Amino acid sequence: MTSKIEQPRWASKDSAAGAASTPDEKIVLEFMDALTSNDAAKLIEYFAEDTMYQNMPLPPAYGRDAVEQTLAGLFTVMSIDAVETFHIGSSNGLVYTERVDVLRALPTGKSYNLSILGVFQLTEGKITGWRDYFDLREFEEAVDLPLRG
């Protein structure tokens, strides 16, 4: 997705670094674009039945229904307003992304550009695993929204 996200200092100056070079990378980039729909029912179509999703600071969700419920729950408290993938690569069935998501806390209206490392596993064109690594405390403090229990 092309957006107004300022390129982080860590990002490659080579725009091809964020372009897909394999079918799995293409699917992941399509999914990244779809995230801004903030629609769990639309997003779950990218997932296999036997899947998992985890924002690494938080508990995992196993199975398609649990992943959809987790996403739907997240979208009640935040929206994903933009996603910019600066680096993407893959090896041995894993796709890695370095990206910035613009997240807005719905209760406070505050937005924050969150740097995220995402790891995706795909089988037959469907996501079987998705793990995002980021600093949860940094996000919570920036938008005044505690997500941890």
From Swiss-Prot:
<dbReference type="Pfam" id="PF07858">
    <property type="entry name" value="LEH"/>
</dbReference>
<protein>
    <recommendedName>
        <fullName>Limonene-1,2-epoxide hydrolase</fullName>
        <ecNumber>3.3.2.8</ecNumber>
    </recommendedName>
</protein>
<keyword id="KW-0378">Hydrolase</keyword>
<feature type="active site" description="Proton donor">
    <location>
        <position position="101"/>
    </location>
</feature>
<comment type="function">
    <text>Catalyzes the conversion of limonene-1,2-epoxide to limonene-1,2-diol. Can use both the (-) and (+) isomers of limonene-1,2-epoxide as substrates and also has some activity with 1-methylcyclohexene oxide, cyclohexene oxide and indene oxide as substrates.</text>
</comment>
<dbReference type="GO" id="GO:0018744">
    <property type="term" value="F:limonene-1,2-epoxide hydrolase activity"/>
</dbReference>
<dbReference type="InterPro" id="IPR013100">
    <property type="entry name" value="LEH"/>
</dbReference>
<feature type="active site" description="Proton acceptor">
    <location>
        <position position="132"/>
    </location>
</feature>
<comment type="subunit">
    <text>Monomer.</text>
</comment>
<comment type="pathway">
    <text>Terpene metabolism; (4R)-limonene degradation; (1S,4R)-1-hydroxylimonen-2-one from (4R)-limonene: step 2/3.</text>
</comment>
<dbReference type="InterPro" id="IPR032710">
    <property type="entry name" value="NTF2-like_dom_sf"/>
</dbReference>
<comment type="similarity">
    <text>Belongs to the limonene-1,2-epoxide hydrolase family.</text>
</comment>
